[in-house]
Amino acid sequence: MNRTVKSISILPAYRLKAAVALAGAALVSFGLSAARADDLAVWDDQTFEGQSAVIEQLNKDFEAAHPGVTIKRTARTFDDMKLTLKLAVSAGDGPVVTKVNQGAGDMGAMVKEGLLLPVDEYIKKYGWDKRQSDSVLARDRWEGAKFGVGKTYGISGLAEIVGLYYNKKILDDAGVALPQTFDELLAALDKLKEKGVAPFMMGSAKQHLALHMIGAIDQAHIDAANRAELDDLIYGKGGSWNTKGNIESAKLVQQWAQGGYFYPGFEGISGDDAVQLFISGQGAFLISGTWYFGDMQNNPDIGFMAIPAPKGIYKPMSVGGVDLAWAITSLAKDKAKQDLAGEYIDYMVSEKAAESWAAAGYLPATSLPADAKPKLTPLLTSGIEMWKTLNANDALGHYPDWSSPTMLKTIDDNTPLLLSGKITPEAFVDAMDKDYQAYLKDKK
């Protein structure tokens, strides 16, 4: 789930050329069908310049391999997609293929109303389950109101990890070593503050940096061996958000906000603008996701790592998963249209598409082909290694807002109150849990 919206990610020209060149080379065998004089309406959320360049080239390649087919592309921000997708499909004038946010509020609601078609047939036909693990595909499964089981309604092209961005030059200038444990991170923040350096870049006016910070800190304190409780929450099996760990995470973030650990004026800065400030050299750390790799690579001093875990946590979890899923809507009325949509999605999650994304500096969910030799940025190299480790350790965590249709709004409404000290950490977590318990009650 890509949580970023408005800003444009400007890639260096040579990276855009590399991405386009690799995408152009991707005209290989990907199940070509007979030519069909047809249009395919597609909505995606790749609004960043670097992302959009890759999608545009991939679309051109698909059209070239399918004479007569025209991709009618509409790019929408994450927030716009949430507002308009379900209504557009319901009204009959939306996309045939779309990106859709996983979780109860979007994919779950659309499945419930019959607005999305299962893609299990295409998983089997194209072998998508060989490209991505079952635990990743489970994030696109719904059976009635049950999340994580049943039929599969989508598949994603990009992987996502929420982690710790750091500016190595700022740390070196302040005499601060890269933290290896959570206690070392806390000590580093104190030292940076003493030196007059903003420890964290933050922007809370728009987007969801604070949400990711709270979730990432909490899940870094969970060992993968003990992940069942979190899984149950996200997949609607029950439990409570009102835990000591969630309260402590909210308390720590509130203390940072109140204690001068965030960039001055963060309350009036959007998340995307905060990222641009960080790229320009403001702030030592920033907690967010790999979807900013395309922007972050413009500053060679910026690195990326997992949130340092406390002692005793051997396989810490990281918030993350995959970006919005490619899905087929109910507007694919006949089998020919459905099969064309399935072919399109197959190409978007193919090894060649993964190679194009990697060349542009983004983290693909599908493994790169064995003979691929893209020039990987240091950030992407770090991201790929983290992705491998998290999957090997079964330590890929969850976005908290996936747990109910209204959880994102509940968190967004209460986060400014938490950061400003107008509500306690206990009240913040209680609001999340009340939302969740109401959802569980409505499901019955």
Model-derived features with residue positions:
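Conserved N-terminal structural module of periplasmic/extracytoplasmic solute-binding proteins
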Residues: 23-24, 35-115, 124-131, 178, ...
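Extracytoplasmic/periplasmic substrate-binding proteins
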Residues: 45, 212, 217-222, 248-337
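Extracytoplasmic/periplasmic substrate-recognition and gating elements
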Residues: 60, 64, 91, 150, ...
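Hinge/lid segment of periplasmic solute-binding proteins
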Residues: 104-162, 212-213, 304-305
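Short, solvent-exposed loop/beta-turn-alpha elements that line the ligand-binding surface or hinge
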Residues: 120-135, 220-248, 298, 309-318, ...
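Extracytoplasmic/periplasmic solute-binding protein
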Residues: 144-157, 162, 186-238
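Glycine-centered hinge/linker elements that transmit conformational signals in sensory
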Residues: 189-192, 232-266
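C-terminal capping/gating helix-and-loop segments adjacent to ligand/active sites or protein-protein/ligand interfaces
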Residues: 363-370, 383-437
